[in-house]
Amino acid sequence: MANPLYRKHIISINDLSREDLELVLQTAATLKARPQPELLKPKVIASCFFEASTRTRLSFETAIHRLGASVVGFSDSSNTSLGKKGETLADTISVISQYVDAIVIRHPQEGAPRLASEFSGDTPIINAGDGANQHPTQTLLDLFTIQETQQRLDSLNIAMVGDLKYGRTVHSLSQALAKFNGNHFYFIAPEALAMPNHILHMLNEKGATYSQHANIEEVLPELDILYMTRVQKERLDPSEYANVKAQFVLRASDLIGAKENLKVLHPLPRIDEITADVDKTPYAYYFQQAENGIYARQALLSLVLNE
C-alpha cells in the first residue's frame, strides 16, 4: 500500500484524513515501542523558527536526531537575512529548500507555512505553528496521548478551557477529533476568548456536538479529557490580559468527583492556570503528553520522508 503522506506538505490538520491520522498514530506507537535510530539517515531537515518556542523546537530536533537525520536552522530569525536585510519569506524558503529534505517552520503570521509551501518546490513543509491559526503536530501528539490514555478517539467527552479564541492548539485539536464519531466538546472560556465561529461552523458541518459553559465544575463529572490552555499574553493588549488571565484556574480540589479515567492535558507552557498540586494527582498527564511530542513528530517525519 502506498504511503499517502510521502513528500506531502503538512500545513493544517485538515490536510490529513482520518486514515492519515490513524497511520501517524500507529507509526508513533511503533517508534515509541521500538526506536529506529537510523531510519532517516543521512537526511537533513531545516528547523526554521521565526517565533519563540521551547517544547516544539526541542522535540522536533530530538525527533530528528533520534531518527538519524541531521538538523540545521535557526531559533531567532532576527539574525537571518530575512530579519537583518529584509529578505522575503519566499526567497528564504526558496534557498533553504535547496539544502534540505524537509523544512519545519514556525511563524507568527497566519498563513506563512502555506505561503512557504508555494516556494519550496519538492521539499515538504511541516507547520510547527502559525499565529493563532494551526498547530498540526501538537494535535498529533494530543491525539496520540488521548488514544494512549483512553484506548480510543471516539465517543469521548472533551473539555477545552481558557483561551479558545487565539489558542491554535484547540482549533486544530477540535477539528481533528471531529473526524471521529460520537465526541462531545465542552467549550469553557471567557466571552472575550470564546471558540471562533468558524470552528463552531466546521463542527456543525461534521455533525459534532458541543456546548459552551462558564465554569469547569458543572461539566467535570462527565469528562474524559480536560484540556487546559493558557491565556496568551502575547496576543492580547495588557488591559484585556489582566481581565481574563486568572478567570479559569484548575486546582487539585477542583478534581473531586472526576471520573477515574480523566486525564488533564495542557500544550504548555502553563503560567498559573494549573496549580502545582494538580501535578501530584493521578489525573495530570501533561508532562507525558509533552514527551509524546517526540514520537508523534518522529512518526510524521518518517512518513513524509520515507516512501
UniProtKB/Swiss-Prot annotation:
Catalyzes the condensation of carbamoyl phosphate and aspartate to form carbamoyl aspartate and inorganic phosphate, the committed step in the de novo pyrimidine nucleotide biosynthesis pathway. The keyword Metal-binding does not apply. One of its GO terms (cellular component) is cytosol. One of its GO terms (biological process) is 'de novo' UMP biosynthetic process. This is Aspartate carbamoyltransferase catalytic subunit. GO terms for molecular function: amino acid binding; aspartate carbamoyltransferase activity. InterPro entries: Asp/Orn_carbamoyltranf_P-bd, Asp/Orn_carbamoylTrfase, Asp/Orn_carbamoylTrfase_sf, Asp_carbamoyltransf, Asp_carbamoyltransf_Asp/Orn-bd. It comes from the Bacteria. Pathway: Pyrimidine metabolism; UMP biosynthesis via de novo pathway; (S)-dihydroorotate from bicarbonate: step 2/3.
